[in-house]
Amino acid sequence: MEKKAFVTKDMIEKIAEKYPTPFHIYDEKGIRENAKALKEAFAWNKGYKEFFAVKATPNPFLINILREYGCGCDCSSLTELMLSNAMGVKGEDIMFSSNDTPAHEFEYAAKIGATINLDDITHIEFLEKTIGYLPKTLSCRYNPGGYFSISNNIMDNPGDAKYGFTTEQMFEGYKILKAKGVENFGIHSFLASNTVTNDYYPTLARELFELAVKLKEETGAHITFINLSGGIGIPYRPDQEPNDIRAIGEGVRKVYEEVLVPAGMGDVAIYTELGRYMMAPYGHLVTQVIHEKHTHKEYIGVDACAVNLMRPAMYGAYHHITVLGKENEPCDHKYDVTGSLCENNDKFAIDRMLPKIDIGDYIAIHDTGAHGFAMGYNYNGKLKSAELLLKEDGSVELIRRAETPKDYFATFDCFDIYNKIDFDA
């Protein structure tokens, strides 16, 4: 698919007068259209709900847009629970899917009524001892092990993942939970990441639906929901095609009718926990070129770095780059596009063919709406950037200010050194 930026050079020049680069900017129109399409794709299931993966983009202004389309929150930590609660997301609208979970996080999840998704069979006893009881509704995360394949193509390796119950543990766990008074059960599974195929969800659904039927038959458990989690990806590269969410929803419906309905389980709700799919395409990291270097390679230095977008440095991930104002110029120059960290992997692109770039140019790095700002950090004392929302009417709203040196040094505020720092630097 063609990768086009949702901002222009003229727009960014105007925005940068008020909000200096680098910054993440999100497209409200795109977010809304996508959320609406997802809701429509699963409208056939009466209980369907998307629990947005807060870890992907933990910004309340963006999450509140999704809430207008019925989305809840998928949380994996205490602070994500705290944020969701502060936003007014309550009870069953929060799914707490965690692993290696500290006791206090279970306590808080139970306190605010979140649905708890257990990652391990030993967590049954741990949860009961921690909060003094077991909730009437609980979910268990399933990991079948081995390789997960679609049409003989290996998609991922669940057997190497730290998450979830084995098949045997699912049956044992359900029996234990039922004996302890749990009344409503859920099944959760995440078996592949960033899949760019319409077949992932239907294939996963078949495996989970068939498991659900067996669990019901062998344990008598009342299964009220099946959570397909995340895994629907996006086309980061121009040579990839996007998923068709309507085809995906229809594929899941067909399997639902084939497997669950004949088993008398036609009332089971379908849940999803999408993050990347909901937000990634609708975010850009906008940065300005501040240096060029001509040595063994041609380098373009920008004012953003891996602090602002970690994925290329951490995973070698591809993020498309648009040189704003030069969209129609030939990509006949080969560059490494770099940040200023003291790490050689701080590169947004390596040997990337781009138009001729000049100091002062603005660059839009695509698909940063999920796992972009969220994965930021402060190595080298670098500060995280602002987040902006491009509204449907064309106006721009600040939805998170940029960090300041005072933020960076805040945890020293109880020590004498804090008062000696020159905050006017």
Where are these regions (language model features)?
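Conserved, mostly hydrophobic/aromatic
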Residues: 31, 55, 77, 109, ...
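A charged N-terminal "starter" segment
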Residues: 1-136, 175-179, 183, 217, ...
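ATP-grasp fold ATP-binding core
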Residues: 137-143
